[in-house]
Amino acid sequence: FAAVSVDCSEYPKPDCTLEYRPLCGSDNKTYANKCNFCNAVVESNGTLTLSHFGKC
C-alpha cells in the first residue's frame, strides 16, 4: 500500500484550467483538479495532503 501523492513542486499557479479530474484532500474537500489542489497545498504550508483520487 503506497501513500497517494501529487507533485506540487511547480505550484502555485495564478490560473487553473477548468479541467475536471477531482482529488480528495485531507480536509475532506473535493478539489476540481491538480492545479486547484496544489494551490491549496501551497496555501496550507504543506499541511494539506491528498486523501485519494476522485471525489471525497
Swiss-Prot record:
SMART domains: KAZAL (SM00280). It is found in: Secreted. One of its GO terms (cellular component) is extracellular region. Glycans are attached at N45. InterPro entries: Bifunctional_prot_inhibitor, Kazal_dom, Kazal_dom_sf, Prot_inh_Kazal-m. Keywords: Disulfide bond, Glycoprotein, Protease inhibitor, Repeat, Secreted, Serine protease inhibitor. Disulfide bonds join C8-C38, C16-C35, C24-C56. The record marks L18, E19 as: Reactive bond 3. Its main location: secreted. Signal peptide: none annotated. One of its GO terms (molecular function) is serine-type endopeptidase inhibitor activity. CDD domains: KAZAL_FS. It comes from the Eukaryota. Residues 6-56 form the Kazal-like domain. Avian ovomucoid consists of three homologous, tandem Kazal family inhibitory domains. This is Ovomucoid. It comes from Callipepla squamata castanogastris (Chestnut bellied scaled quail). The lineage of its organism: Eukaryota, Metazoa, Chordata, Craniata, Vertebrata.
